[in-house]
Amino acid sequence: MLQTIYNETKDLMQKSIQALNREFSTLRSAKVSVNILDHIKVDYYGTPTALNQVGSVMSLDATTLQISPWEKNLLKEIERAIQEANIGVNPNNDGETIKLFFPPMTTEQRKLIAKDAKAMGEKAKVAVRNIRQDANNKVKKLEKDKEISEDESKKAQEQVQKITDEAIKKIDESVKNKEDAILKV
């Protein structure tokens, strides 16, 4: 039963790290990523639909993205959705595709985005600590119900702490890597 708690704890913490990395993909670094458009929804016949579901999004170079809609009549809707998303660029509609030209980031912008990355990392650490607390509560309940001894409980809590320390270390590494990518000119 303790092994089950350890496995659940590792799994949940790993999911928190994966969620952090997905969140990082929406941040702009030196090269513009197509993921920066992931949160944009287009009005597709009255239904809010993810941009990547109504057309292909590709990176032309480090500062340019191109959107090729499956249906040409969606160009205006895509253009409006991008403007409403307020991502800092104006869409350039050529009648066939929409191009987004991102200006090079200033040092100030880089620092702000790096600060956002750090805040995301802190949120992930809080999630990991909450998972640790839940695991420790399960261990204490087993001890209280006399299913494990006090010594086993202490060892189990130490093991949960080791798992937590590993997860926090991975989060710190992810944050450092993302900050380096953002601040790199």
From Swiss-Prot:
Residues 138-159 are annotated as: Disordered. It is found in: Cytoplasm. GO terms for cellular component: cytosol. GO terms for biological process: cytoplasmic translational termination. Keywords: Cytoplasm, Protein biosynthesis. GO terms for molecular function: ribosomal large subunit binding. It comes from the Bacteria. The keyword Transit peptide does not apply. Belongs to the RRF family. Responsible for the release of ribosomes from messenger RNA at the termination of protein biosynthesis. May increase the efficiency of translation by recycling ribosomes from one round of translation to another. PANTHER family: MITOCHONDRIAL RIBOSOME RECYCLING FACTOR PSEUDO 1, RIBOSOME RECYCLING FACTOR. This is Ribosome-recycling factor. The gene is frr.
